[in-house]
């Protein structure tokens, strides 16, 4: 299964509470920080929900 590198590129200040919770659930706290995740349907759904805040690369 492929890996995804997810990077927070925009601030979560002033965003909807469920979007903030989704970003936090992905393990992202600060702008510019990245985390690695397995490419699963659950992770893809979270990424799609807040895609306007993230940069995603397949590895």
From Swiss-Prot:
Disulfide bonds: none annotated. SUPFAM superfamilies: Ribosomal protein L30p/L7e. Keywords: Ribonucleoprotein, Ribosomal protein. InterPro entries: Ribo_uL30_ferredoxin-like_sf, Ribosomal_uL30_bac-type, Ribosomal_uL30_ferredoxin-like. Transmembrane segments: none annotated. Coiled coil: none annotated. One of its GO terms (biological process) is translation. GO terms for cellular component: cytosolic large ribosomal subunit. GO terms for molecular function: structural constituent of ribosome. Pfam families: Ribosomal_L30. Gene3D superfamilies: Ribosomal protein L30, ferredoxin-like fold domain. It comes from the Bacteria. Belongs to the universal ribosomal protein uL30 family. Part of the 50S ribosomal subunit. This is Large ribosomal subunit protein uL30.
